[in-house]
Amino acid sequence: MIEIIDLHKSFGNFEVLKGVNLKIEKGKITAIIGKSGEGKTVLVKHIVGLLKPDRGKVIIDGVDITKLSERGLDKIRRRFGMLFQESALFDSMTVGENVAFPLREHTNLKEAEIKALVKKKLEMVRLFGVEDKMPSELSGGMKKRVGLARAIALEPEIVIYDEPTIGLDPITGRAIYRLILDMQRHLNGTSIVITHDVPAIFDIVDRVGVLSGGRIIAYGTPEEIIHSEDKEIQEFLRQK
């Protein structure tokens, strides 16, 4: 369980998060949706301890991570996998080296074991025989898949997907969503998807939180959000 309590964050005079309250259920896929610039990525950075709030708590399995030292946060972060907006691949590394990076950093596996795991993770995201390619040789959708393979390399308990379909065409975007659902079933963990891509995301998630004006203004199942009578939510959904 991840619980966010009265989370506030400002940058200078600009207040981004104005008292976010949210419970992210274990073993579920939760989407956090909202317009661009609403602070979705800022919220994610608090969940993994990359930002400290001005006030409020982020509690993961009973531990308030806002009180942890950097060493304590490092242990927490090892429980996470992240797929970033732009895939965040290392341009100077091959695909195989990119996926192997967390395995080399955080395990004592032998090179043969790492290569076998890299092949397995790439096959899980429907990529075959691409280990020696460079990121520059890949399409946008393939880069996302490599990023996903790297995110799940250590079999994380929690995976965060930050705008996983941004820059992709609708067909490729739907394929990425199907992979997210497959990874959730494989890992049997907790998934958090940050997106403004609605209603497509509603097909795979269990819960939806709507971030607007620095707060979560609604939380429920996709059906509950779709049928909400809140004018702001309906306006957001109509724009999509």
How should these model regions be labeled?
Residues 48:
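Helix-to-loop junction immediately C-terminal to a conserved catalytic motif
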Residues 153-157:
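A short, proline-enriched helix->beta-strand linker immediately N-terminal to the Walker B motif
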Residues 63-64, 111-129, 181:
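Conserved ABC ATPase "signature" region
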